[in-house]
Amino acid sequence: MKRAVVVFSGGQDSTTCLVQALQQYDEVHCVTFDYGQRHRAEIDVARELALKLGAVAHKVLDVTLLNELAVSSLTRDNIPVPDYQPDAEGIPNTFVPGRNILFLTLTAIYAYQVKAEAIITGVCETDFSGYPDCRDEFVKALHHAVSLGMAKDIRFETPLMWLNKAETWALADFWGQLDLVRQETLTCYNGIKGDGCGQCAACNLRANGLNQYLGDKVGVMAVMKQKTGLAQA
């Protein structure tokens, strides 16, 4: 039996990963993390979507210690979430230091226990928003460390790594779930479901990608299929 675990936030990217995983694996588990995030409504959204889409198990892990250690606008109510700034440079204040290190490591422990062969995460280097822990180099390095530490090679799959947001929308559409991802996921840093607040960086990235996809569905779909190997599907 092919078994995978999805790092699942209930946002656009991880939901698209879950939708695809359910087509490619016999059994799919989801792991969601409660770290006291400002947009913690995503946890309820994740629960709803995992149940609706058919994950066999959904584990919500309490990692509120991360909130105590990592200072970010996503972990502190007194630090405002910045509006979208297309020319911004450097690491944004929405970056939560160590988040993906912790999430992937804990998910690997869970995957080890349920005998899963793969961990799937929606990180993306193409539209990575300046987050260093969304880079391919980081994921490969952590995978190497985890494999050594567990003496077991649990694959780290990153199906969105080289897709832009328009192509990620195309992937959701390919699997017949564009409307669900658009209406029922929560990507917004301010915790607003669907199209979100329209002001934060996450909402702008999501909206711009959707508009680009809807403006050239055939072209974007073709590029996505080539990048993902779905061209033969």
Curated annotation (Swiss-Prot):
Pathway: Purine metabolism; 7-cyano-7-deazaguanine biosynthesis. Binds 1 zinc ion per subunit. Keywords: ATP-binding, Ligase, Metal-binding, Nucleotide-binding, Queuosine biosynthesis, Zinc. The keyword Nucleotide-binding applies. Zn(2+) binds at residues 188, 197, 200, 203. Its cofactor is Zn(2+). Pfam families: QueC. InterPro entries: QueC (IPR018317), Rossmann-like_a/b/a_fold (IPR014729). Signal peptide: none annotated. ATP binds at residues 8-18. The keyword Cell cycle does not apply. It comes from the Bacteria. Gene3D superfamilies: HUPs. Its EC number is 6.3.4.20. Belongs to the QueC family. Catalyzes the ATP-dependent conversion of 7-carboxy-7-deazaguanine (CDG) to 7-cyano-7-deazaguanine (preQ(0)). This is 7-cyano-7-deazaguanine synthase. It comes from Klebsiella pneumoniae (strain 342). The lineage of its organism: Bacteria, Pseudomonadati, Pseudomonadota, Gammaproteobacteria, Enterobacterales. The gene is queC.
